[in-house]
Amino acid sequence: MSLDKITATDQVAAITKYNTMPSDEMAIHGTYHAICYSIDGFIKWDEPIQNLVTTVGKNLTLDTILGNSAAGAVVMGLKGVGSANVADTQASHAGWLEVGGTNAPAYSGNRPTPSFSSAAAASKATSSAVSFSMTSTGTVAGCFINIGGSATKDSTTGTLFSAGDFSSSKSVINGDTIAVTYTATLT
């Protein structure tokens, strides 16, 4: 009688993960696009800028969407020299000042109210540019959006939703017009 020997050399390994959850993260980003036209209609400068969304702006977004709260009117303004910070509020932004009213350069009228198109592909954009008609000479360093506050320049009411800085400060003179669009995107 013969004996067959069997030697097992194959190995099997398996790993099982339990309690795994899909990751679903969301971030909000925005872009301003500012174009300065001379009194003759020529482009003096053209700058797209990434903005930051402030902490109070993110909180307002959550409260509005999930808390059944009304956001309020949206207005846009211009900022002077100094960097925006996520901790900035409309009442307290120590790194910069709003321009247009007390701080030069001045522009005519109140803070303009942008119109927005319907959201699509996780983005919401202005349907047309808002215009700032400059009435004096000075330096502009960026843009901001206020929600639920006053359209009056230098008002500290409402929520500072976002602010963005140009790559460098921009000079303007009386007769210049700054046209600004904005797009917010959720990723």
Question: Residue locations for each model-derived region?
Answer:
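Small cysteine-rich, disulfide-bonded extracellular modules of the LU/uPAR three-finger superfamily
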Residues: 1-142, 147-187
